Amino acid sequence: MKVLSVSSEVFPLIKTGGLADVSGALPIALKAFGVETKTLLPGYPAVMKVIRDPVVRLEFPDLLGERATVLEVDHEGLDLLVLDAPAYYDRPGGPYLDPLGKDYPDNWRRFAALSLAASEIGAGLLPGWRPDLVHTHDWQAALTSVYMRYYPTPELPSVLTIHNIAFQGQFGSEIFPGLRLPDHAFAIDGVEYYGTTGFLKGGLQTAHAITTVSPTYADEILTPEFGMGLEGVIATRIDDLHGIVNGIDTDVWNPATDPVVHTHYGPTTLKNREENRRSIAEFFHLDNDDAPIFCVISRLTWQKGMDIVANVADRIVAMGGKLVVLGSGEAALEGALLASASRNPGRIGVSIGYNEPMSHLMQAGCDAIIIPSRFEPCGLTQLYALRYGCVPIVARTGGLNDTVIDANHAALAAKVATGIQFSPVTETGMLQAIRRAMHFYADRKLWTQLQKQGMKSDVSWEKSAERYAALYSSLVSKGM
């Protein structure tokens, strides 16, 4: 089977979040199930800088008003189609934001162009290759199925994956003519959304199947609390909605071989984590004692529950724990966490910014990780933690709920528990979970059991890729 994947970011070329990890790992995992994937992504400067010996495969003299070229290149196991359109993508800043952190005002055109190019490739415009199905990711690629629906070309089966429904790609009605869609596409069953132009909304109306990145999140987005205004649209597509949890690259995330981990280990050699633990204490200037080290590796935002972490940091120390934080985000939260570190020298350490090697070492050396997200479509951090024997303490939401088995009495007795869940996401809820963790930590046999069971969890892409392959086959066989 041939699949065209369309994404605004793909790891390892360009990444701002989990979307890139999925769009970079899933095509490789799908190979085992006979799925040949070409991935279309924008030619940002970061992408153009690293690709080698690309081949020109297609030219668009007028892609929504600008010239564009499709380049094909193999990169670290990925078959990439790079949309080289300098007018859209060759600019400073990130994929979506300018150097001042503001949305590019023409983001609607930049990603409509990506979707239009994808629809043309889906229609067979790429010489010698035509996909059987198109798989699009988030609002930036969601118009692909809209173009395929309204353009006079054969319509292919399509899948739209929602990685985070909070990001919807909503723009004013005045941009609609620039999309070059027929007038009747600006309607309730098209892209019109309360008088605006909704990219994700249009994709939800026109894709043949919709997936989210965990089963719980698929249920949550049907509710007003999590649906972000689109729950009504999604409810009309409930029979086409599937929750498929993400996996991780278990070669990159492997404590037995990870090059940045100071001492390698596995489920039977957990004592080797001690050297990594000492490295963490040294980096964050912590006292060298046996108190449990809790860590946070996160964007410092309200959605991630970081205001709660900031508010309880002193109390974690008072309870006998230590805390280390790696991340960046809202200035007020950064300041609050730095202040807590100043008040608690040797017990709290904070590093503002993101450091990929340090994130690996923290998973390999800290005792537990706190993930108190108010909503979390899937989450990858807890999967890394399970893999590394860093016991996850998670809010009972989204993919966190699907991937961490709470250490309740029944799960402990059955020896299947892998972490600690808590709800509601409040200071009291989090502190109760941390208190439970410290109780378990005091019983080293029980704590080791939690670590080992977590490390045995299958967090690879294999099961997820198998489900995607089955979904693809179902749609293609139905001729959707």
Curated annotation (Swiss-Prot):
CDD domains: GT5_Glycogen_synthase_DULL1-like. The keyword Glycosyltransferase applies. One of its GO terms (biological process) is glycogen biosynthetic process. It catalyses: [(1->4)-alpha-D-glucosyl](n) + ADP-alpha-D-glucose = [(1->4)-alpha-D-glucosyl](n+1) + ADP + H(+). Signal peptide: none annotated. Keywords: Glycogen biosynthesis, Glycosyltransferase, Transferase. Pathway: Glycan biosynthesis; glycogen biosynthesis. Its EC number is 2.4.1.21. One of its GO terms (cellular component) is cytosol. Transmembrane segments: none annotated. The keyword Membrane does not apply. One of its GO terms (molecular function) is alpha-1,4-glucan glucosyltransferase (ADP-glucose donor) activity. It comes from the Bacteria. It holds the Pfam family Glycos_transf_1. Belongs to the glycosyltransferase 1 family. Bacterial/plant glycogen synthase subfamily. Synthesizes alpha-1,4-glucan chains using ADP-glucose. This is Glycogen synthase.
